[in-house]
Amino acid sequence: MGAIHDEPFTACGDETECFGGNREGSQSFHSSSTKEENLEDSYLYLVHQRSMSIFFWDERANTGVAGAVDEGKIIDFEFLNPDEKRIIEEHANKEREEGVDVILVNFDRREYMLNLRRWNMGTSPLYILVSGRYNVVKGCRLKEGNEIRIWSFHFDDQLNLAMVPLTPTESG
């Protein structure tokens, strides 16, 4: 299970008031903690919204499942910085073992370490979160059919994803 993140995060947009500037195609982001300066130049990007959860628990297999996201369904590729794009590309071309390390912050502020990779399968590349998805599914008690929205942001130069449920899960 991931660690609890002590600082509440606030995303600007429909639900909350915006603090700070806005960059075209993104929403500004801030932490209400004293570490706000670390997020001063951070932007929040909507990466993906899915009516069937990208993560869910498969009762029959008794395992956590992470669905792949088709490249064409990613809403904004600006969530990756140039170095992260290069790493993803190198992994897809089998030039490196791992993709990009990601911290996923869920709706109750628990953090999970994952690895984002691109797999070239079929006509469109797939982006998938690996190495820890079981913990996300189990810790969040996600079931097939839960609706989620995934946002990205950088904190201290680390790629983070925020998972926001659109439908209730067993844990919240």
Curated annotation (Swiss-Prot):
Superkingdom assignment: Eukaryota
Keywords assigned by UniProt, alphabetized: DNA-binding, Nucleus, Transcription, Transcription regulation
UniProt keyword DNA-binding present: yes
DNA-binding region: 69-169
Gene Ontology cellular component annotations, sorted alphabetically: nucleus
Cited InterPro entries: At2g31720-like, DNA-bd_pseudobarrel_sf
GO molecular function: DNA binding
Residues of the signal peptide: none
Annotated localization: Nucleus
Name this polypeptide is given: Putative B3 domain-containing protein At1g05615
Originating organism: Arabidopsis thaliana (Mouse-ear cress)
